Amino acid sequence: MFGVTLAELSASLGDPVLALGLAAFALLLLAIPISFWMVSGGSNSAVVTLLVALANLVLTAQLVLRWWQSGHFPISNLYESLCFLAWACTLAQLLVERSLSSPIVSAAATPMALLCVAFASFALPETLQEASPLVPALRSSWLVMHVSVIMCSYAALLVGSFLSMAVLFTDRQQTLELRSSSIGTGGFRQAKLATSSMDQSDGLRLSSINLSRTEQLDSLSYRTITVGFLLLTLGLISGAVWANEAWGSWWSWDPKETWALICWMVYAAYLHTRFSRGWSGRRPALVAVAGIVVIVVCYIGVNLLGIGLHSYGWFFEA
């Protein structure tokens, strides 16, 4: 699926839009090993932030150039939407890192943008990478409103969900027993600290640091997912209004509409467990991880089917 010939790579370098996509891929690919090295004890967080910021600027230039070439907002095919999603993921990562400067954030978030750019650059056929005229139904201001908001919601939900996944791994490094939480912010918790061969004061100090980091990740993932959920809600509402204007129906149970609703319900369940049940830590994190699978099915899986109004085409046969 990811096999790219030398001739195809040369052709990509000849197209400035595709070349910018490859440049963003190279920057993100370079950032990943550095971010994981930081997690293991390195101290080059500024380097990763710089690489991700450069990748975001390159993707911005790519989208603006495609917009200028095509004459419409660049989210009309799978290549453009993947690049837009990568742009939104890098932007979300940079915003999250302003709240919590931790190597875990970059190690969890950077691979998502890399996968989006890699899939767009190396897996899609040329027919889905080229700009094409919009069909009449898509020549609407609702295109920018609906699709861009949905893509941004996916980015926020994915970043938040991968931060929740990081909570699962950081929890494993300590014996943390959660009792309750104040609306997902970790307001009250009890921790059972593990004993070790070191003296008690050192053990308490290390466990307190780990607990604080886990709480921060848990709270930050909750807030990021909340933003993504609100954007997803807005995207679904705008999509329904647009559908009614274009086709005379608010909801048609199109495959992507159905899976978008499932996605909304999964993250609604996540927020319910945080807000109403007082869950925090591992249990809501598992719900968020399930949301990642639903987003992948909703965004990529529907295109594998090649059916419905939202499908960009069955790209394995394109």
Swiss-Prot record:
GO cellular component terms attached to this protein's record: plasma membrane-derived thylakoid membrane
Keywords per UniProt: Cytochrome c-type biogenesis, Membrane, Thylakoid, Transmembrane, Transmembrane helix
InterPro entries registered for this protein in UniProt: Cyt_c_assembly, Cyt_c_biogenesis_CcmC, Cyt_c_biogenesis_CcsA, Cyt_c_biogenesis_CcsA/CcmC
GO molecular function, one term: heme binding
Topological type in the membrane: Multi-pass membrane protein
Compartment list: Cellular thylakoid membrane
GO biological process: one example: cytochrome complex assembly
UniProt main location, coarse: membrane
Main function: Required during biogenesis of c-type cytochromes (cytochrome c6 and cytochrome f) at the step of heme attachment.
HAMAP family: CytC_CcsA (MF_01391)
Subunit structure: May interact with ccs1.
NCBIfam families in alphabetical order: cytochr_II_ccsB (TIGR03144)
Protein name (Swiss-Prot/TrEMBL): Cytochrome c biogenesis protein CcsA
Lineage start: Bacteria, Bacillati, Cyanobacteriota, Cyanophyceae, Synechococcales
Gene that encodes it: ccsA
